[in-house]
């Protein structure tokens, strides 16, 4: 049962879920709330969390809500039992699989691939051995797939993997032992690229992409709007920290001089290669948890954008707080660690000017936000 927080809502606020898997699947928690009350609850929950952390916010911008049917990346679990493969999400607070036939969150193209996976995996998945699949869409409707927990290959299996790529419409399939292991490409039918504003990267396997194109656009717009409050030109340097494959860097490059720093070697290297030939763009492989950009390096910059993973950016926030950057923009998928990092920036003399909530984790308790800090 995934009907969370039911005690917080009156019976008038509850609705019947349109998803047949809602009672078992652990992916969505809030499908049983009316759309109006869902949006109010999401926004109020974020405001309450930040207020509890004693953050003074000058302006709350109108929240952005991304509707279902737009998710272009998904992580699924698969389990083969006898000659049948079951695909789905884990049950809520459990490692047990909740098989699904379809998911209302996904784009039609991604849903079509998910429907074909059970048959395609029959000759690849081992009996009673759970595996994880990441499938995501890049430029041109090309799909990348990474299978975690299955690292054995052989002539027969290689043929099955190639057949899976053809059957499911996957441009590339890679294996990795676990989430921390290097991806080993098994089949690559077409080069996969991702264009972000002024740059195009060769997308590494398992590279991070925002869950939805609409959510990505909303976050980019929020960042650019935050910087537009300041009179910066193409010669002014902006640091893009925890840059991934350049989601923000490429769009910043249209207006400013940009330096990107990313700790994941594959993603950072894709930016290093993309930077060749760009006079106003540079990139480096840098673990910002262990080696944050410090004050003396920030002297030449006019702004910084940071978009860390869920763990936040404590070490980097401490360095930014000591800087004299007129504007720092934080993007976060975890309001709790954002609040911690924001308190560090405020203690360093920054003011939290605006908060923009972007809800692209539809029907879940998670949300994303963009905060603009000024000094």
Question: Model-found features: residue ranges?
Answer:
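Feature of Fe-S/electron-transfer and energy-metabolism proteins
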Residues: 65-72, 135-136, 240, 245
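Short, well-ordered strand-loop elements centered on a beta-strand within folded domains, enriched
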Residues: 82-91, 141-148, 181-183
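A short, glycine/Asx- and small/polar-enriched loop/turn
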Residues: 68-72, 141, 365-366
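Short beta-strand micro-motifs enriched in acidic
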Residues: 77-81, 136-140, 374
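Extended interfacial segments that mediate partner engagement and assembly in macromolecular machines
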Residues: 4-17, 23-128
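Rossmann-like S-adenosyl-L-methionine
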Residues: 3-9, 123, 152-375
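Internal alpha/beta scaffold segment
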Residues: 96-131, 137-139, 151-174
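Short, solvent-exposed loop/turn elements at beta->coil junctions and helix N-caps
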Residues: 60-67, 132-136, 178-182, 356-360
């Amino acid at each position: 049962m995934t009907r969370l927080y039911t005690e917080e809502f009156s019976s008038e606020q509850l609705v019947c879920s349109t998803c047949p898997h809602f009672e078992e699947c652990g992916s969505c928690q809030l499908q049983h709330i009316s759309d109006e009350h869902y949006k109010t609850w999401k926004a109020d929950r974020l405001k309450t969390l930040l207020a509890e952390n004693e953050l003074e916010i000058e302006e709350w911008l109108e929240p952005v809500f991304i509707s279902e049917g737009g998710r272009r990346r998904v992580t699924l679990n698969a389990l083969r039992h006898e000659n049948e493969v079951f695909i789905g999400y884990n049950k809520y607070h459990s490692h047990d699989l909740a098989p699904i036939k379809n998911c209302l969150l996904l784009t039609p193209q991604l849903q079509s691939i998910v429907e074909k996976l059970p048959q395609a995996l029959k000759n690849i998945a081992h009996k009673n051995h759970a595996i994880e699949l990441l499938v995501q869409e890049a430029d041109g409707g090309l799909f990348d797939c990474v299978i975690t927990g299955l690292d054995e290959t052989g002539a027969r299996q290689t043929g099955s993997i190639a057949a899976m790529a053809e059957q499911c419409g996957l441009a590339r399939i890679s294996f990795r032992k676990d989430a921390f292991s290097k991806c080993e490409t098994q089949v690559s039918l077409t080069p996969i690229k991702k264009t972000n504003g002024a740059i195009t990267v060769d997308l590494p396997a398992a590279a991070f992409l925002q869950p939805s194109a609409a959510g990505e656009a909303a976050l980019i717009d929020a960042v650019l709007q935050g910087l537009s409050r300041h009179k910066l030109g193409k010669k002014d340097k902006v640091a893009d920290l925890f840059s991934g494959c350049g989601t923000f860097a490429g769009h910043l490059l249209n207006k400013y001089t940009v330096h990107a720093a990313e700790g994941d070697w594959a993603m950072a290297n894709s930016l290093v290669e993309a930077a060749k030939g760009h006079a106003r763009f540079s990139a480096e492989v840098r673990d910002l948890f262990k080696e944050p950009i410090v004050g003396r390096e920030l002297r030449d910059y006019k702004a910084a954008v940071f978009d860390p993973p869920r763990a936040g950016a404590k070490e980097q926030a401490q360095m930014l707080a000591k800087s004299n950057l007129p504007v720092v923009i934080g993007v976060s998928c975890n309001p709790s660690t954002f609040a911690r990092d924001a308190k560090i920036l405020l203690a360093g003399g920054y003011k939290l000017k605006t908060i923009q909530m972007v809800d692209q984790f539809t029907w879940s308790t998670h949300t994303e936000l963009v905060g603009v800090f000024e000094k």
